[in-house]
Every structure is written in structure tokens, then in C-alpha cells.
């Protein structure tokens, strides 16, 4: 199967190594002669093809993104909730989960977990054109090439494959953890290249731990502040807390979130303090056990490396 797109809005498909071609020129909602910016075939289904279009040279900055699941017999728009003025440059499909898609647009990047029915924008990507996307399949990294701002890498996006609407309704969810290698981190000196020396930070050493919290983990005092703030915004009367409530707030310990690492025997080898805010979070375990220093909440130092083996996180 060979699929090509042209600069005048055509998509041509060949099933005989280029000896003959089917022409496709009508796509739902896409203007005639729109520039085809990208064409990809699915890694999971021979009849599934994704095409993105660009019509900004005619003053139309809308995103145009379509898919066929029957080899081109019918096409469906999957632009859905991509911003109206954020036209699409490129699209890639996850190599393991066909529901996961990524697009690069004029103002950033989006991802979908439902084959384009809905999209979410990456929040920490600069507002710049993302002209090309590539997936490093061995590491599950997403590499983005921007126009004028270099390359950006999303390290190990594999939790997105597991992410779903039911997870958002849970109190908490811990995503699957990948195996990793243990090694001694080197600290080489810079070479004599002066101002030409450039390096980009690697992911932290160790195992990435990803989790989702359905709500902020709050103390009684923080919860009362939230309720009172909402009442103030609505113009409602705010009752002064009773002495019993104030005493309970004062005695309560500040709630914390810890990721607990255990070995194959169930013994705890490390606890890692993590964010207690609502949403998706990442943390790293550096493959070391507890510090040998005096125990305290402020002591976040690590101890010696743990022996290779099977470990769990809770």
C-alpha cells in the first residue's frame, strides 16, 4: 500500500506498487485544493489512513484532519476540539495502542486517547509550530521538531496508553511501571568547545513512577478555606468555625502523599514524597534505599543502591 498527498488537496492510493492509483479529492469539511501536510497509514490496520490539510494561504487557519477506516471508500473528520485557528502540520499513531494519536499544530501539540474523537493540548510546550513528530518505539519517547525553537522530547509517554475516562473518576490510580537498568552515573567534564558546547538534560536516573489523583489531598483547614472561598464568590454568608473545628484543624497533621517501594519479600526499601495535587504526576526512584542519616521528614537523602531484583510501588 502506497499513499501520497499533494499540494492541491489530492490523496492518491496505490495497492499494486504504484502501477495504478485511486484519486480522492472530497473530504468532509475540507476545502478543495487544501495543501496536504501529512499522510500516514496505521501500524495496526491496513485500511486505516490519516490525512491532515492546511489552508492558511487562503486565510483559513482551521485544523483539517480526516481518517478512513475502509481504505478510502469513506472519510471522517477527527479535528473535533482542536482550537479553531490551530491548523495541523503532522500526525503520528502510537505503535502499541491504536487509540493514541499525536498531532503537531501551528501553536503546539495535542494528543488523543480515543482515535481523534477528542483532543488534549500539551500544556508545557511553547506556543510554536510543531512541523514534525516521530516516536522512538524502543523508549516510548515522542520527539517533536519545531519551527525555530529546536527539538522537544516527551520522555516515556506510555502512561497515556493506560489513561482513560474511568481513571479520572477514581480517587487515585498508579500507572504501570517499566523495567529499568541499574548503573553508576558518570560525571564527565566538558570538552574544549567553548560556547559551542550544548547539552540537553536527560531524564532523571532511575524508575519513573506515574500516578493520578482525582482530587487535591487537603487538610481540614485547607478544605474549610476552599468551602469558604466558594461561598464568598457566590455572595453567601460564611459561618465562623466552632472551637471544636478549630481545635481539630490545629491537631491534624498535614496530609502527605508517599510512593512506597517494597522488595520481593514485601519489605519497605524506600518512601518517596510526592505531589498531593489533583491531576497526573511523575516522580523518580533512584534505585536507592533509605538514607543512613538520622530519620526525619526533612531528610530526603538516599542511601546505597538496592540489589537487582523485582520491586513494587504502592
Stretch-by-stretch model annotation:
Residues 31, 268-302:
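Glycine-centered tight-turn motifs at strand-turn-strand junctions
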Residues 118-120, 265-272:
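Surface-exposed loop/edge segments in extracytoplasmic proteins
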Residues 2-3, 55-57, 247-251, 301-304:
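Short consensus segments that form the blades of beta-propeller domains
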Residues 183-256, 282:
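Contiguous beta-strand segments within globular domains
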Amino acid at each position: 500500500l502506497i499513499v501520497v498527498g499533494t499540494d492541491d488537496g489530492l490523496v492518491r492510493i496505490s495497492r499494486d506498487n504504484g502501477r495504478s492509483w485511486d484519486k480522492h479529492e472530497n473530504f468532509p469539511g475540507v476545502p478543495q485544493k487544501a495543501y496536504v501536510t501529512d499522510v500516514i497509514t496505521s501500524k495496526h490496520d491496513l485500511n486505516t489512513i490519516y490525512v491532515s490539510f492546511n489552508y492558511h494561504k487562503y486565510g483559513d487557519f482551521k485544523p483539517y484532519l480526516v481518517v478512513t477506516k475502509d481504505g478510502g471508500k469513506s472519510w471522517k473528520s477527527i479535528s473535533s476540539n482542536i482550537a479553531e485557528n490551530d491548523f495541523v502540520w503532522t500526525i503520528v499513531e502510537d505503535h502499541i495502542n491504536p487509540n493514541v494519536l499525536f498531532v503537531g499544530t501551528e501553536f503546539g501539540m495535542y494528543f488523543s486517547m480515543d482515535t481523534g474523537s477528542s483532543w488534549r493540548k500539551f500544556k508545557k510546550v511553547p506556543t510554536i509550530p510543531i512541523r514534525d513528530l516521530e516516536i522512538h518505539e524502543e523508549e516510548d519517547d515522542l520527539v517533536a521538531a519545531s519551527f525555530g525553537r529546536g527539538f522537544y522530547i516527551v520522555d516515556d509517554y506510555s502512561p497515556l496508553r493506560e489513561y482513560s475516562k474511568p481513571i479520572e473518576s477514581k480517587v487515585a490510580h498508579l500507572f504501570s511501571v517499566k523495567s529499568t537498568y541499574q548503573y553508576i552515573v558518570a560525571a564527565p567534564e566538558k570538552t574544549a568547545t567553548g560556547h559551542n558546547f550544548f547539552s540537553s538534560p536527560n531524564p532523571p536516573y532511575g524508575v519513573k513512577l506515574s500516578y493520578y489523583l482525582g482530587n487535591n489531598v487537603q487538610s481540614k483547614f485547607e478544605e474549610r478555606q476552599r468551602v469558604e472561598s466558594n461561598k464568598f464568590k457566590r455572595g453567601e454568608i460564611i459561618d465562623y468555625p466552632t472551637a471544636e473545628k478549630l481545635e481539630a484543624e490545629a491537631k491534624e497533621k498535614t496530609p502527605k502523599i508517599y510512593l512506597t517501594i517494597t522488595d520481593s519479600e514485601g519489605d519497605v526499601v524506600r518512601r518517596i514524597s510526592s505531589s498531593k495535587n489533583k491531576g497526573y504526576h511523575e516522580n523518580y526512584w533512584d534505585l536507592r534505599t533509605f538514607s543512613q542519616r538520622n530519620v526525619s521528614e526533612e531528610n530526603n537523602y538516599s542511601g546505597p543502591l538496592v540489589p537487582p531484583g523485582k520491586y513494587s510501588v504502592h
